[in-house]
């Protein structure tokens, strides 16, 4: 029966739906949404990195006071707990700012994440206390080793959740959607099934309505400031129009606008002169490039001509080498013939001289 009553109350005209849906386009704070700073998160991450380095290098850092190493590590752990508590208050303040900006889902995600580093530090401090109390009965590892392990686990766990926080805040800074808290204004007015209608009876609806009221209060505060500023300006201009006060503000405003216009015109003239100078320099560079290209073409033609001459002289040298080789061969043949004729003459003279 309750489902039927809800179903009978759901049908609405398009005009009535649009009356509530138009609220999405009437969020003044959306155009003035401020990004959340991550400087504190990065500082806390650097602190955790230094804490992890201290835990890893404690035997070398405290080698001169080894008997005081457990006490010093406990002091460092307590200091981390205190600093984490301070940073947690800062992170909770940032999450509240995100909630007041109308981003309910981001604030719900971050609300649980920002408290986990302090919880991890508190659990680590409790574990450190148990190690100190049960020191006589612990024989597996040394006390300093157990303390260093606890410190490393604290640093890694807190760093992991702080990385999640940084990722969510970075996503919030880069998001460009409307505030999701406004959905609670019109979502119950839309037709829904019986199972979907049950979600409005959860405790989350009251939290969403509270966030919506806070967001609307911020919108009203912002609009009040804008209205006061506009009323102040209007009163100044009305007084100047009545003649009760001179139009000093208007004249000052016009003079300021005139000065800005002159400044802009001077900057524009300077930019135009610089542009003309740049164009002249570009023209000179183009002419120089053309001259270099023409000179390069001449060098290429001269190189081609020299290559042709070199090839011609190479052919001539080859012909001369061949002719020289032929001449050498003919000369060697002549020398052989001369030698043979001399031997014949010597033989003839020797035969003629014999009786």
From Swiss-Prot:
Principal localisation:
membrane
Loss of this gene results in the following: No visible phenotype under normal growth conditions.
Q: Where is the composition biased (Basic and acidic residues)?
A: 331-340
Q: Which residues form a coiled coil?
A: 220-337
Q: Name one Pfam family in it.
A: TMEM192
Family in the record: Belongs to the TMEM192 family.
User: What protein name is recorded for this chain?
Assistant: Protein FIP1
């Amino acid at each position: 029966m309750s489902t039927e009553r809800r179903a009978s109350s759901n049908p609405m005209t398009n005009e009535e739906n649009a009356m509530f849906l138009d609220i999405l386009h009437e969020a003044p704070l959306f155009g003035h949404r401020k990004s959340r700073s991550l400087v504190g998160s990065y500082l806390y991450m650097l602190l955790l990195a230094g804490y992890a380095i201290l835990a890893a290098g404690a035997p070398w850092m405290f080698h001169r006071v080894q008997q005081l190493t457990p006490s010093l590590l406990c002091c460092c752990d307590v200091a981390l707990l205190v600093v984490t508590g301070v940073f947690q208050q800062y992170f909770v303040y940032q999450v509240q700012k995100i909630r007041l900006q109308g981003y309910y889902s981001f604030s719900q995600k971050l609300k649980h994440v920002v408290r986990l580093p302090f919880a991890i530090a508190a659990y680590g401090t409790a574990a450190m206390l148990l190690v100190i109390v049960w020191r006589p009965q612990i024989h597996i590892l040394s006390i300093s080793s157990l303390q260093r392990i606890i410190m490393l686990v604290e640093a890694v766990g807190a760093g992991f959740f702080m990385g999640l926080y940084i990722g969510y805040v970075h996503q919030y800074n880069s998001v460009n959607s409307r505030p999701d808290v406004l959905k609670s204004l019109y979502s119950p007015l839309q037709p829904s099934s019986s199972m979907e209608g049950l979600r409005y009876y959860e405790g989350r609806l009251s939290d969403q309505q509270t966030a919506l009221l806070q967001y609307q209060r911020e919108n009203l505060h912002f609009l009040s400031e804008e209205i006061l500023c506009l009323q102040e300006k209007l009163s100044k201009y009305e007084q100047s129009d009545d003649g009760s006060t001179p139009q000093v503000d208007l004249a000052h405003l016009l003079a300021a606008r005139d000065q800005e216009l002159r400044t802009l015109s001077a900057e524009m003239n300077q930019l135009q002169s610089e542009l003309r100078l740049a164009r002249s320099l570009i023209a000179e560079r183009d002419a120089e490039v053309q001259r270099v290209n023409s000179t390069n073409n001449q060098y290429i033609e001269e190189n081609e001509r020299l290559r042709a001459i070199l090839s011609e002289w190479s052919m001539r040298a080859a012909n001369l080498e061949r002719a020289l080789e032929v001449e050498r061969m003919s000369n060697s043949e002549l020398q052989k013939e001369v030698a043979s004729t001399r031997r014949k003459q010597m033989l003839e003279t020797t035969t003629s001289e014999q009786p």
